[in-house]
Amino acid sequence: VVAVKTSEFEPGDITAFYYNNKLLVRRVICTGGSQITVEKDGSVLIDEQPLDEPYLTEKSIGQCDLEFPYYVQPGNVFVMGDARAVSMDSRLTENGVIPTDRILGKVLFVN
C-alpha cells in the first residue's frame, strides 16, 4: 500500500489504517460533523442528501448494527469497504468510526 499522509479527508477518499494489528483499506463515506444514514437498500445519505457512489457495482446494507441516522463526531471518519455485502467497517459498532489521527494516509496504490 502506498499512501500520502494527511489529516484532511473527504467522502470518496481511500484510506489505510490498522485495526487489531491488521492493515485495512477502506473508503471514507462521511467526515466528522456530518450525519450519515444507510438505507435498507444500501443507499447512503449524508446530511439527508444522496451520496453519489459511481465506484460501487452493487449497493448493500451488509453487516450493520448501527442505528441511523448516525452523527459522526469531529475528528473521525465513517468508512466502508467497496464490497459492501461482506465488508467489516464503520457500520459495525465493534469497528466504529476511525479517528483521523489513526489513519496512515490517503491510498494512492495497492499492490
Model-derived features: positions:
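Feature for secretory/organellar precursors and membrane-associated catalytic proteins
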Residues: 1-71
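Acidic/glycine-rich C-terminal interaction modules and beta/coil loop segments
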Residues: 46, 63-107
